[in-house]
């Protein structure tokens, strides 16, 4: 029988519930337990696919093509289980499901209400997500409830968790509450009152936390922990100090040293073997003792909110771990390049253009790509970054003046990138769309496998085939591929059914690769990713060349 740990948050949002939940999962997995994680989002959107990155941050794409919360990326990076569509659901999905049942007559004429119909549906979704992992043999499912205790939006989720813990019975459910203990500079002390009130609010709705994770910018003294313990009715050893760390990969060890996993296992009636965090210790050692220092320029338009590129930033960190390199990521606004030029790129060891949507800032990205191509700077283009590399090459090398994407200029004289209208998904189902299709849920998404061209850099990196995740509407236009290849570009991977370009490279450049997919979604600190490791190795070589 699966046991559940519900993770809630109080006082303010953005305290790191996802990292806390993932770190706990990593410790439990190191103790031999089969663990999965779920994220419950209280917003009414069906998924975050059409939400602004400035509002939501990154959209993480799962293997089965779901557009989900960025916390699922943390989950996959911290544990071995893969996340799927069932691991993330929203208020919008819950209400959509309940209303569909009501229209079918499933409720037999009853008045449909938040309790019991919405809360029952939430519980069913939670159980379904837990059962989907480990062939139904999940030992522990950690359920992160989005939002902050006290918000109206998350009340149905909290009530569902309360009901579920009651139904499951003793030693089958536990509650972990993450809260803030702010330091007030003018008073020169930490304040515990917000945490006391947050726990009080939680207890008012019938939830009594087994464990408090108290976030602060510094370790919390024992006397302050004792005060929190007394006023929240949580044992002192279960009031955990979680201070700011310079790497999220230090959090599992921080929690384990304070006995978090023992407290959770005791609450769940589990007696697994001791934790083995040697892998995490090795990762931290590699982070703290690099042999190289590199500056990678990430040129985008969401650079004011780096959460928009969370998986990508972490993938570069992972590559740094596996090449013993300290990676300094410099986020560069592409619109700034349009006004100030490319001189600001001269100090970079490599340049990366990530995925994105819309016309704004694209000419600045194209200018950065041209700089990388003409100056031998290692370049990695992901999704839009590959499309723009093709546009830049078409304009300045292949002689296709005015080349563009129909996303930015529908009447471009040379539409080297265009909307794909028909393709086959990972299950073999034919999908169709046109310019009038809904934006939500209509992209080519999820993992797809394709063969790699022999003798290319792509083959040296991936081997004979590549299996990566996608999230895009536009593709390189096959009509122009012969002209691009004549000018020196190599299309090094194509989809097996539609023959669409998946990878491009320039063989006469030290390292210039574009990929239509999103490799950052499969990078982990444990294994890194061969594409990012190759990119960072090229950056190391470029740095050495500049220093010589």
Curated annotation (Swiss-Prot):
Glutamine amidotransferase type-1 domain boundaries: 295-545
Pfam families in alphabetical order: CTP_synth_N (PF06418), GATase (PF00117)
Chain residues that bind Mg(2+): 71, 144
Active site per database record: 383, 518, 520
Enzyme class: ligase
GO molecular function per UniProt: ATP binding; CTP synthase activity; glutaminase activity; identical protein binding; metal ion binding
PROSITE patterns: GATASE_TYPE_1
Region (Amidoligase domain): 1-270
Protein role: Catalyzes the ATP-dependent amination of UTP to CTP with either L-glutamine or ammonia as the source of nitrogen. Regulates intracellular CTP levels through interactions with the four ribonucleotide triphosphates.
Quaternary data: Homotetramer.
UniProt-listed HAMAP family: PyrG
Family statement: Belongs to the CTP synthase family.
Note from the entry: CTPSs have evolved a hybrid strategy for distinguishing between UTP and CTP. The overlapping regions of the product feedback inhibitory and substrate sites recognize a common feature in both compounds, the triphosphate moiety. To differentiate isosteric substrate and product pyrimidine rings, an additional pocket far from the expected kinase/ligase catalytic site, specifically recognizes the cytosine and ribose portions of the product inhibitor.
Name assigned to this protein: CTP synthase
Source species of the chain: Bordetella petrii (strain ATCC BAA-461 / DSM 12804 / CCUG 43448)
Highest classification ranks of the organism: Bacteria, Pseudomonadati, Pseudomonadota, Betaproteobacteria, Burkholderiales
Gene (name only): pyrG
